[in-house]
């Protein structure tokens, strides 16, 4: 189905999230069917995963909306060259959706990721129910001009086939003083629902925290994992104090966590919080922090998607167990050197980003 095929009408994303917080069945509301075009498997109960029990959810402090604590990231993994096979990406989105995930994070910076998300959300009939997290970083031709930002917003809406973006971030704090003001105007005008700021490097955590402390953003997206716990120093406490939602990028350290545990069995104590795979082990550690709203692991592999989404079910580790998990990881060779490893070890994503980077390196 074309990415610009309008999905059938249904309840708004706000209604879906409110229904989740009330425990209302996702397949039906008092008035009847929710979304006729949604796959049957996607119409499981909100707050449950196809009969596997309650999902780990978080309530957004500034709205009362509730979201599942695992979503989908798309950097590199959803970037494909035009014409390349991408059925696996559709299956990843379907798997996440059927498993209860509702947040998908993307960006114009991510090559063809927006096209893929828009096309497959449309073909699955979930366009109007997905909670979209997106980004902008441009402003305009001169100080105070927002023409480039508006063009970026309109382009994203066209690719994703939406007339409103749920969470719009200033990407990597680029032009942040101007962009946040633009986002606040868009929120007031109804073009977006929430204002956010993002970064993926520890060096910028103080800057992220300062924006949280100004009380002008609703969300922050930050790197955080069992390996990289730097956000606990200032970003997460500030977000918890100010009622700001926290999206987590790099919760699996771009596959580097899996690399260091390759061939290793889970510790026996992982059974105490229902972890059956390393993905569950790492993701449950992240979302067990009460400051975290939603972790955004990325993958292009449907089997890995199933492992990731399984972290939504079962008990979460308490503070003492989380400390024990860290101590265990610190005994594994290579864990303390993860930052020195390349992203996605042993794997190359052949998309538009890589093609452009290779071409630029050849010319420079």
Over which residues does each language-model region extend?
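Glycine-rich, proline-tolerant flexible connector loops at the mouths of alpha/beta enzymes
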Residues: 105-121
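Conserved, mostly hydrophobic/aromatic
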Residues: 60, 72, 104, 117, ...
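Glycine/proline-rich, positively charged
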Residues: 139-230, 234, 240-247
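N-terminal small/glycine-rich loop or linker at the start of catalytic domains
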Residues: 63-80, 133-136
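N-terminal secretory signal peptides
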Residues: 1-12
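Structured C-terminal cap/extension of enzyme domains
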Residues: 26-31, 60, 234-364
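N-terminal twin-arginine translocation
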Residues: 10-15, 26-47
């Amino acid at each position: 189905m074309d990415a610009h095929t309008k999905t059938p009408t249904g309840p708004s994303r706000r209604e879906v999230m409110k229904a989740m917080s009330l425990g209302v069945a996702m397949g039906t509301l008092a008035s009847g069917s929710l979304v006729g075009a949604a796959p049957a498997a996607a119409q499981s109960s909100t707050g449950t995963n196809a009969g596997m029990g309650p999902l780990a959810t978080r309530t957004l402090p500034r709205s009362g909306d509730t979201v599942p604590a695992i979503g989908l990231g798309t950097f590199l993994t959803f970037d494909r060259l035009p014409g390349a096979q991408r059925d696996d990406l559709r299956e990843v989105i379907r798997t996440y959706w059927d498993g209860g995930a509702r947040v998908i994070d993307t960006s114009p910076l991510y090559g063809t990721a927006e096209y893929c998300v828009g096309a497959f959300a449309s073909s699955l009939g979930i366009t109007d129910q997905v909670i979209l997290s997106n980004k902008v970083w441009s402003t305009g031709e001169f100080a105070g001009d927002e023409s480039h930002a508006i063009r970026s917003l309109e382009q994203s809406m066209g690719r994703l086939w939406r007339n409103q973006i749920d969470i719009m971030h200033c990407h990597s704090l680029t032009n942040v003083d101007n962009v946040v003001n633009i986002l606040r105007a868009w929120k007031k005008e109804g073009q977006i629902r929430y204002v956010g700021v993002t970064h993926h490097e520890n060096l910028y955590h103080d800057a992220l925290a300062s924006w949280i402390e100004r009380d002008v953003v609703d969300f922050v997206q930050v790197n955080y994992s069992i390996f990289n716990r730097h956000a606990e120093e200032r970003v997460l406490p500030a977000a918890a104090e100010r009622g700001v939602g926290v999206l987590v990028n790099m919760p699996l350290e771009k596959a580097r966590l899996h690399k260091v545990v390759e061939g290793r069995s889970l510790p026996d104590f992982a059974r105490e919080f229902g972890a059956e795979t390393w993905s569950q082990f790492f993701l449950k550690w992240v979302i067990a922090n009460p400051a975290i709203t939603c972790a955004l692991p990325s993958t292009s592999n449907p089997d890995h998607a199933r492992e990731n989404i399984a972290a939504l079910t079962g008990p979460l580790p308490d503070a003492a167990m989380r400390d024990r998990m860290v101590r265990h990881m610190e005994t594994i060779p290579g864990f303390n050197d993860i930052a020195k490893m390349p992203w996605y070890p042993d794997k190359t994503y052949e998309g538009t980003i890589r093609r452009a980077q290779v071409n630029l390196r050849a010319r420079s």
